[in-house]
Amino acid sequence: MASKKGNRIIIKLRSTESAHTYTTTKNRKNDPNRLELRRYDPTLRRHVIYRETK
């Protein structure tokens, strides 16, 4: 028997200024839209905006 899908899914966050990617989870129920977070980019050595990709 298959288990039901939970509300948490794994997503990728890609930097808007470089090719760096973070992996995180989000709750489908609380955040139905695409995430946009300000995170540290080690390639640029500063904080930039990361957007959720498919």
Curated annotation (Swiss-Prot):
Pfam family, one: Ribosomal_L33
Gene Ontology terms: cellular component: cytoplasm; ribonucleoprotein complex; ribosome
GO terms of biological process kind: translation
GO molecular function (one): structural constituent of ribosome
Source superkingdom: Bacteria
InterPro entries tied to this protein: Ribosomal_bL33 (IPR001705), Ribosomal_bL33_sf (IPR038584), Ribosomal_zn-bd (IPR011332)
Keyword Ribonucleoprotein in record: yes
Ranges annotated as spanning the membrane: none
Keyword entries, A-Z: Ribonucleoprotein, Ribosomal protein
Alphabetized HAMAP family for the sequence: Ribosomal_bL33
Family in the record: Belongs to the bacterial ribosomal protein bL33 family.
Protein name per UniProt: Large ribosomal subunit protein bL33
Provenance organism: Roseiflexus sp. (strain RS-1)
Gene name per UniProt: rpmG
